Regions:
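Conserved beta-strand scaffold positions in the cores of enzyme catalytic domains, especially
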Residues: 28-29, 100, 127, 131
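Adenosine-nucleotide cofactor-binding segment
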Residues: 1-63
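Helix-to-beta-strand junctions that scaffold the AdoMet/dcAdoMet cofactor pocket
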Residues: 70-72
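Alpha-helical segments flanking ligand/cofactor-binding loops in enzyme cores
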Residues: 18, 64-68, 91
Length: 159
């Protein structure tokens, strides 16, 4: 993460956590979830909480963890696709003054990201675990959605 002082990665899936460790995606790796994870983040940040949180799982529990782990005035970036809208428990959030950012890839940053990829400064090859032609897209999406065979990303190839 460019410019990040400390990166804490949380994932209850041991296989994904192993992949993250092997590719040195963070300085700290946690397999705990919920309140235990939020408390662990506070412990690793001298009680402050995270300056910024990227929520990429898309569950009610991961959304709750994201805002609970963030420090007051922190940023919570929601990049996951939620099946249903998360509930904002405003009475519990009151006083945190959080900044929420939503959405997928910002086209304004694509040039910078492509340059980092070209220069070899951003390595993403390990994320592509499965490939297949467009004619198998439904099978590929099913594999991706249900994380079959350790799928992280399924990429469409030329037929």
């Amino acid at each position: 993460m460019v410019g990040a002082g400390q990166v804490i990665l949380i994932d209850p899936n041991e296989e994904r956590l192993k992949t993250a460790r092997e590719n040195r995606l963070a300085g700290e790796y946690l397999s705990v979830t919920g309140q235990e994870a939020a408390e662990a983040v506070k412990g690793l940040t001298e009680g402050r909480g995270a300056d910024a949180v990227i929520e990429a799982a898309g569950t009610e529990a991961s959304f709750t963890l994201a805002w609970e782990a963030a420090r007051p005035n922190g940023i919570v970036a929601l990049v996951a696709m939620y099946e249903k809208d998360p509930v904002l428990p405003l009475t519990r959030m009151y006083g945190k003054n959080l900044i929420f950012k939503t959405g997928g890839v910002d086209a304004a940053d694509c040039r910078e990201l492509l340059e980092l990829l070209r220069e070899g400064k951003l390595i993403t090859d390990f994320l592509i675990t499965h490939r297949g032609p467009l004619s198998q897209i439904l099978e590929g999406y099913d594999t991706f959605e249900h994380k079959k065979d350790g799928c992280i990303k399924w990429v469409v190839t030329a037929e």
